């Protein structure tokens, strides 16, 4: 009788290492939603969730204008493209408005990237500047069951 061989995906390998390799340092920072009109969408979300304050910021390097709504345990980030080469513009053309990514915050993004790469996780580019002075990078959706995931580290 031959031994049974199980194929292990990147996601399974990553999840198997959670308890051993400090993944408990991660927490949900925000859920990002691509929208056509960030001002209108921000008003809709403010009314729906009774959020008083919204922060607006343009991130030139990413080609987006964002509205950040602060909830008790996480944030909602609404993203509108500011130019035709924005990845959000392409996302909207292909899929329409909707969930774009989930962001996880870590205290040390460089260490977390190194750890995750050791688990076989693939990244889309290097660590770079994000909104509100954060450092960010994105995990390839193929590494985590089709979900685009951002890692971020606050100053």
Question: Where are the predicted features?
Answer:
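Short, structured motif recognition centered on aromatic/hydrophobic residues
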Residues: 28, 42-45, 69, 76-79, ...
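Short, charged/polar surface micro-motifs in flexible loops or helix N-caps
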Residues: 72-76, 83-85, 109
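N-terminal beta-strand motif that seeds the catalytic metal site of vicinal oxygen chelate
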Residues: 18-42, 97-106, 155
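Vicinal oxygen chelate
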Residues: 6, 67-70, 104, 110-155
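N-terminal mitochondrial targeting presequence
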Residues: 1-24
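C-terminal "cap" of GNAT-fold acetyltransferases
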Residues: 59-75
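A cross-kingdom feature marking solvent-exposed beta-strand/loop segments within repeated
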Residues: 27-29, 41, 48-63, 83-100, ...
